[in-house]
From Swiss-Prot:
Protein name: Dihydroorotate dehydrogenase (quinone), mitochondrial
Main location: mitochondrion
Annotated GO biological process: 'de novo' pyrimidine nucleobase biosynthetic process; 'de novo' UMP biosynthetic process; UDP biosynthetic process
Lineage: Eukaryota, Metazoa, Chordata, Craniata, Vertebrata
Binding site for substrate: K99, N144, R145, Y146, G147, F148, N211, V212, S213, S214, P215, N216, N283, T284
Record: residues binding FMN: A95, G96, F97, D98, K99, S119, N180, N211, K254, T282, G305, G334, Y355, T356
Topological region Mitochondrial matrix: 1-10
Protein encoded by which gene: Dhodh
Length: 395
C-alpha cells in the first residue's frame, strides 16, 4: 500500500511538472483546455498539496507571470459600465485569492475583467492556526477559516504603488482594481481600522470594499447591524470624500448570506440613506446545506463554492428588490459556468466574481464562464450584459 501511494504521488508530481510544462508552452497559449485542468492537473495538485499550500503555489505561479495570456477575446456584448468605470467583461476574481496584492497583473492575464485584492488589515496578522482550509471535492466546495491573514496595509500599499501607473492604464482600458478592507483581530475600534484602510489604499483603488461579513473574525458580522453599520459607513465615506484627487474610489459593502429578513431591510435602508456605491453579495456561509457529501463538511468556517450558489443568488434577488435596483451589485458565490453568472445577473448583479471554481477547474474556467455567458445572452435575445441585469424583476 505504501509503495502504491508513493507511486501515485510521483505520478501526480510528473503530471504537474511535465504536464504543466506542456501546458505552459501549448495548451494555454491557445484557448486553455478545460478537460485537462479539471480531470488531470487540478486533481493531481489536490492529491499532492494541502489546500493552503496549493493556494500559495497558485498565487506564486500567477504572480511570476508563468501562465500565458488567455486568448479569449471579450466582445462588446460583455462590457459593463458601472461604479464609474468601464469593465471589459463582468467576471472578476473575488477577494481571498490574492490577499496581499502579489498577483494582480497575472490575474488580468487570465482574462478577469477586474481584480479584487484583500482582505487587507491595518497591521500584519497571521490569522487563525493551520489547518484552516478544507476541500470538499464531492461538493465542489471549500471551507475556510483563514481569519484575515494579512501582510498589512504598508506592504500591500508598497506593492500596488509600484504598479500604480500601469493600473491607471489598465483601468482606462476597462480592467479596474478593487481593494477589500478588513479589521485586525485585536482592534477595539473597528471603524478606525477601516478608515485607515481608506486613507492608505483608497488612492490606489477604483473601488473599496468594507468587509463586515467574514465569519472568521469574532464580532465582525455584528457590524452589519443597522446602528453599527450606519456609524461605520459614515466614517468610511467621510474619509473617502477627503481623499485628494479628482477620481475617488467607489465604496461597496460586502454582506453575508446568513441574514434575517430584518437584517437585509436594515442594510438596504442604510445603503440608500448614505449613498453607498455598491454591494457585494455574498461572503461565505456558516450554514451547511443538506446533502453535503465531503468528509470535512463539519469543519468550522465559511463554506464557498457550488453549495453557496443558490443562497447567494437569492440574497442578490432580495437586496436588488429592497434597494429598488438603485445600488449596483457584484454577485459572488458558486459561479463556475455562464449559466451561474447569468442567473446572478438576471437576479440583479451588474458584475460577478468567482474563486472556488479555480480550485477545482483551474484558470480555463474564466474563459468558460465568459464564453458560455455570451452564448446565453445571444440565445435569450439580450444585446449586452446590461440588458440582462435585474430582468427577473421585470417579468
Amino acid at each position: 500500500m505504501a509503495w502504491r501511494q508513493l507511486r501515485k504521488r510521483a505520478l501526480d508530481a510528473a503530471i504537474i511538472l511535465g504536464g504543466g510544462g506542456l501546458l505552459f508552452t501549448s495548451y494555454l497559449t491557445a484557448t486553455g483546455d478545460d478537460h485537462f485542468y479539471a480531470e488531470y492537473l487540478m486533481p493531481a495538485l489536490q492529491r499532492l498539496l494541502d489546500p493552503e499550500s496549493a493556494h500559495r503555489l497558485a498565487v506564486r505561479v500567477i504572480s511570476l507571470g508563468l501562465l500565458p495570456r488567455a486568448t479569449f477575446q471579450d466582445s462588446n456584448m460583455l462590457e459593463v459600465r458601472v461604479l464609474g468605470h468601464k469593465f471589459r467583461n463582468p467576471v472578476g476574481i473575488a477577494a481571498g485569492f490574492d490577499k496581499h496584492g502579489e498577483a494582480v497583473d497575472g490575474l488580468y492575464k487570465l482574462g478577469f475583467g477586474f481584480v479584487e485584492v484583500g482582505s487587507v488589515t491595518p497591521q500584519p496578522q497571521e490569522g487563525n492556526p493551520r489547518p484552516r482550509v478544507f476541500r470538499l471535492p464531492e461538493d465542489q466546495a471549500v471551507i475556510n477559516r483563514y481569519g484575515f491573514n494579512s501582510h498589512g496595509l504598508s506592504a500591500v500599499e508598497h506593492r500596488l504603488r509600484a504598479r500604480q501607473q500601469k493600473q491607471t492604464q489598465l483601468t482606462t482600458d476597462g480592467l479596474p482594481l478593487g481593494i477589500n478592507l478588513g479589521k485586525n483581530k485585536t482592534s477595539v475600534d473597528a471603524a478606525a481600522d477601516y478608515v485607515e484602510g481608506v486613507r492608505i489604499l483608497g488612492p490606489l483603488a477604483d473601488y473599496l470594499v468594507v468587509n463586515v461579513s467574514s465569519p472568521n473574525t469574532a464580532g465582525l458580522r455584528s457590524l452589519q447591524g443597522k446602528t453599527e453599520l450606519r456609524r461605520l459607513l459614515s466614517k468610511v465615506l467621510q474619509e473617502r470624500d477627503a481623499l485628494k484627487g479628482p477620481q475617488k474610489p467607489a465604496v461597496l459593502v460586502k454582506i453575508a448570506p446568513d441574514l434575517t429578513a430584518q437584517d437585509k431591510e436594515d442594510i438596504a435602508s442604510v445603503a440608500r440613506e448614505l449613498g453607498i456605491d455598491g454591494l457585494i453579495i455574498t461572503n461565505t456561509t456558516v450554514s451547511r446545506p443538506v446533502g453535503l457529501q465531503g468528509a470535512l463538511r463539519s469543519e468550522t468556517g465559511g463554506l464557498s463554492g457550488k453549495p453557496l450558489r443558490d443562497l447567494s443568488t437569492q440574497t442578490i434577488r432580495e437586496m436588488y428588490a429592497l434597494t429598488q435596483g438603485t445600488i449596483p451589485i457584484i454577485g459572488v458565490g458558486g459561479v463556475s459556468s455562464g449559466q451561474d453568472a447569468l442567473e446572478k445577473i438576471q437576479a440583479g448583479a451588474s458584475l460577478v466574481q468567482l474563486y472556488t471554481a479555480l480550485t477545482f477547474l483551474g484558470p480555463p474556467v474564466v474563459a468558460r464562464v465568459k464564453r458560455e455567458l455570451e452564448a446565453l445572452l445571444k440565445e435569450r435575445g439580450f444585446n449586452t450584459v446590461t440588458d440582462a441585469i435585474g430582468v427577473d424583476h421585470r417579468r
